[in-house]
């Protein structure tokens, strides 16, 4: 299979993802039941390493391959947006040695993998704060963004130095500055106004919030975007995770009745959305 995309006026062919070594294939779900945006907390690296008597850093190293496998699984299934929590604003509290490792690691992962992601048609977007981040990390993230900006097989939101509260605080600060400068009428502030001040106003809402490792919390991740997300928690640690676990989570997501605060069954909501939007849904892989 070759996935095709448009780059300017030229048609570009993306490389097809390699099948999973087990031979497993993505489940065939109706396009409207495939989550458009999956947010994932990559948790359990330290525990995985500890169970094996290894340094915590070894769990992160194994997790790099998991990232690529999950991205390929997204493309195979038809998930168009994936957000990965790579380094939070709270992670600065870890030991200087681990912070140093994670800075180097995130920089090097992007450097090592950006060509492969580009070949697969993945658009990379960095989400997070610039202050405190190493210049070399910022540079690699910016290079990756520029290199992949026209890709359209899927979008990876790579969250480095990100926190949901930090994003909302930054949005509030920017809004306050615009109010003080007379560029924004506070009486007209709405949810749509706040959305415009987020790091990526066009980031779609999270449909499926996925966390491996057995922990059941959001950890300050994409708070605004996850307001109506379906939560799936899995016991597998991130280094043991692969695209089959992603697919299981998506099958569970597809079985749920999303009401968005109302009392109308999911099927009827989908029908109304199709009528209003002209069947704008995620297409089958």
UniProtKB/Swiss-Prot annotation:
Identification of the protein by name: Isoprenyl transferase 2
Chain positions recorded as substrate binding sites: 44-48, 56, 60, 88-90, 92, 94, 211, 217-219
Cofactor: Mg(2+)
Annotated segments matching region Disordered: 11-30
One Gene Ontology CC term in the entry: cytosol
A Gene Ontology molecular function term of the record: magnesium ion binding
InterPro entries tied to this protein: UPP_synth-like, UPP_synth-like_CS, UPP_synth-like_sf
Short name of any one Pfam family annotated for the protein: Prenyltransf
Binding site for Mg(2+): 43, 230
Cofactor: binding comment: Binds 2 magnesium ions per subunit.
Lineage: Bacteria, Bacillati, Actinomycetota, Actinomycetes, Kitasatosporales
Catalytic class of the enzyme: transferase
HAMAP family found in the cross-reference section: ISPT
Its EC number(s): 2.5.1.-
Natural source organism: Streptomyces avermitilis (strain ATCC 31267 / DSM 46492 / JCM 5070 / NBRC 14893 / NCIMB 12804 / NRRL 8165 / MA-4680)
